[in-house]
Swiss-Prot record:
InterPro entries per record: Ribosomal_uS19 (IPR002222), Ribosomal_uS19_bac-type (IPR005732), Ribosomal_uS19_CS (IPR020934), Ribosomal_uS19_SF (IPR023575)
Record carries keyword Nucleus: no
A GO biological-process term: translation
Lineage: Eukaryota, Viridiplantae, Streptophyta, Embryophyta, Marchantiophyta
PROSITE patterns attached to this UniProt entry: RIBOSOMAL_S19
Any one annotated GO CC term: small ribosomal subunit
Superkingdom field: Eukaryota
Alphabetical list of Gene3D superfamilies matching this protein: 30s Ribosomal Protein S19, Chain A (3.30.860.10)
Cellular compartment(s): Mitochondrion
Pfam families from the UniProt entry: Ribosomal_S19 (PF00203)
Gene Ontology molecular function, alphabetical: RNA binding; structural constituent of ribosome
Keywords recorded for this protein, A-Z: Mitochondrion, Ribonucleoprotein, Ribosomal protein
Protein name per its UniProtKB record: Small ribosomal subunit protein uS19m
Length: 93
């Protein structure tokens, strides 16, 4: 369900108080407004900060959409050896 239009976009009040060009943002739920275009933001993903330059295409989206909280899986790496070794079956005559 989307947010009601009469409420307007949610933006944390601390974002309006900052006057720097480079911001550190913990509020992933805040909407990106047109006045943020051209600024650099570092968005917290739960472990560290992810750098991002805000462009016009990002207006209306949330900050959290651009900082993934999950690790990417790497399918190309070799598998770990299993702990139990399979013993070969002896032939019976």
């Amino acid at each position: 369900m989307t947010r009601s239009i009469w409420k307007g976009p949610f933006v944390d009040t601390c974002l309006f108080k900052q006057k720097k060009i480079r911001w550190r943002i913990w509020s992933r739920r805040s909407c990106i407004l047109p006045q943020f275009v051209g600024c650099y933001a570092q968005i917290y993903n739960g472990k560290g900060f992810v750098g991002l330059k805000i462009t016009e295409e990002m207006v209306g989206h949330k900050f959290g959409e651009f900082a993934s909280t999950r690790k990417t899986s790497s399918l190309g790496k070799r598998a770990l050896p299993s702990k139990t070794k399979i013993k070969p079956i002896k032939k019976v005559r």
